[in-house]
Amino acid sequence: MVLIRVLANLLILQLSYAQRTSELVIGGDECNINEHRFLVALHDALSGRFLCGGTLIHPEWVLTAAHCNTHFIIIYLGAHNQSVEFDYEETRYPEKKYFFPCSKNYTKWDKDIMLIRLYSPVRNSKHIAPISLPSSPPSVGSVCRIMGWGAITSPNETFPDVPHCANINLFNYTVCRAAYPELPATSRTLCAGILEGGIDTCHGDSGGPLICNGQFQGIVQAGGKTCARPRKPAVYTNVFDHLDWIKSIIAGNTAVTCPP
């Protein structure tokens, strides 16, 4: 009987340790293959090198981070395992790229956004479908979903073949301001992460989505040298604050005026 109790306690300890260590994987667990139909992968068309993630918001439009731009981009839609190409995957080249033009009341962090018009639209399929733009702003305290092919260890980085997904929390901007004093006193960006550390977006996740309560609210910005540190949440471009610009460009008004 004593031996059984000892073995049972050892099993509990082992399971507890396994749970804690799995929580420390940057980016969480492997995404379900049907969970990220809107997630796209941006590659350098010349070298084939993976650059960033992005989000399909319309059959003809992708939203990503401005710092992901390079001269020649190829976009993979419906991708899951980057080492294996499947018949259902599609590729597109940009027809045109749009960058947020406003300077007044917008810092460089606020403007890390790029809208890409695809050379030709894609059709919805089992593995490809756009996500809607947000209908309301995100609320502090929301649980948000992150996903991407970024590093799953840091600072010694390893990159997965398949995207990883995880849940994080949305904080008040002051939390990121305290973590990164170089940030401006006020900003239109979002602040999200896990205060205890261990789960975070990392290098390679840039441009990918932040999904809060089922709505596409943020775009991953470039992070620091080390990811998933305690009390070091990440900064995301606020999609809702750019809705008028995004919708105007998609509607064909490329000479949009800056919001106040």
Swiss-Prot record:
Keywords: Disulfide bond, Glycoprotein, Hemostasis impairing toxin, Hydrolase, Protease, Secreted, Serine protease, Signal, Toxin, Zymogen. Residues 1-18 form the signal peptide. Glycans are attached at N81, N105, N156, N172. Residues 19-24 form a propeptide. Residues 25-251 form the Peptidase S1 domain. It holds the Pfam family Trypsin. Disulfide bonds join C31-C165, C52-C68, C102-C258, C144-C212, C176-C191, C202-C227. Expressed by the venom gland. It is an enzyme of class 3 (hydrolase). InterPro entries: Peptidase_S1_PA, Peptidase_S1_PA_chymotrypsin, Peptidase_S1A, Trypsin_dom, TRYPSIN_HIS, TRYPSIN_SER. Its main location: secreted. Snake venom serine protease that may act in the hemostasis system of the prey. Monomer. This is Snake venom serine protease serpentokallikrein-1. It comes from Protobothrops mucrosquamatus.
